[in-house]
Amino acid sequence: MASKVYFADLRADMHENLQQKLTRLMKTAGMGDIDFQDKFVAIKLHFGEPGNLAFLRPNWARTVADFVKERGGKPFLTDCNTLYVGGRKNALDHMDSAMLNGFNPMTTGCQIIIADGLKGSDEVEVPVAGGEYVKNAKIGRAVMDADVFISLTHFK
């Protein structure tokens, strides 16, 4: 069975701005029915490399974090370190990159936790059910420790 996909165009008008559209989209998709009360909620997104613009802006993350907090949840933004050398190869550089691109508790309304730790080795190996080529996946511990996982993604 195919998954439902919800879409909102990026046109804003005097009656509804983009953050209001995102809130309506989350409600329409059923996120308002999730029990967030006292739950740690991982909001996974890409913070972007320094100087790069291919990432969702912090105000989008703020909208999701506020939605979760209004329902009693404890949101945090997260991503894992990269395997390649760049601005996200370890947690310290990753946090600097996030801040340079505008992600911080003041702009997003929640903390940032790099899911796989300082050097990218804080992980949990989980089996991939029915995996033909990949039998196990290494998942960042903070993601595995979260009670709820929300993926806030972009496409190019």
Mark where each language-model region is.
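N-terminal and secondary-structure boundary signal
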Residues: 1-156
